[in-house]
Amino acid sequence: SSHPLENPTFLTNIFECCSILIIPMAMIWALGFYLKRKKFGASIFAVMFFAYIVGVGINTYYEMNGNPAIDNMGIAQENGAMEGKEVRLGAAGTAFWSVTTTVTSNGSVNGMHDSTMPLSGLIEMLNMQINTWFGGVGVGFMNYYVFIIIAVFISGLMVGRTPEFLGKKVEAKEMKIATIVALLHPFVILVGTALASYLYVHNPAFVESEGGWLNNPSFHGLSEMLYEYTSCAANNGSGFEGLGDNTMFWNYTCGIVLILSRFIPIVGQVAIAGLLAEKKYIPESAGTLKTDTATFGAMTFAVIFIVAALSFFPVHALSTIAEHLSLYI
């Protein structure tokens, strides 16, 4: 999406970003409309939009402030970190797009994500690793629905109320399925990255036989491998293109990750819906935990952050965060 015939100006760049988001955003409000629970739809939208705006803010800040390694060479960076970016779109336009394309299963890029600053890469990956904000092609916000089930169950236990969602009891069976679905995503990403890292270190002959994978070893090389599996698992399609990934190893392993992370969660989510549909409707009472409040929205955000985001903290500490510290300290 950086070709001048498609995206010629900063204005068209903003318009295309809004086009990417408009249907996923509208689906959240449609959920509240069809359930006749508009406050519930609004609370979901608020959580997702908050995460999106934070991501846009962080990426824009670091891209507009430039690369300290280039500063140390005495090169002025009035326009920000412009490596891998279109001059007519600028660092801010690329930062905006990079977050927009990763909070949805869009995958298009208008600049090279591999050339963004380390914490910008962290945000891009976290959007896909959390795999919840605004949903994406084919699955919508089904992953957010899983975290709602977990949040309802935990919140109910914390305050001593019966866990209920849309008038249906949430019990152990639904919780087990939701937990498996929530943990599968980090599992396939981290196992794939660990396997690739192990082969790179312990079987260099195999890596060389495939033409060598990494043009950027060390911290950024790990980020490239992590991004590859993250993008596959999230059905995104963007990549850190410094990785030589058009090989037998990457095509087969990424295909396996894509299949597992695409279809197993859908089966689990539909199973939860089926289990809840079979249960008797329970009218709201004084003991019902309300799911359309700001408090529950904050609880859901906390569950998403703890279960999804923190699962990836160790690998980010060795890749994006370590690279950031190497530049700024």
Question: What is each stretch, according to the model?
Answer:
Residues 1-329:
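Membrane-proximal intracellular helices of multi-pass ion channels
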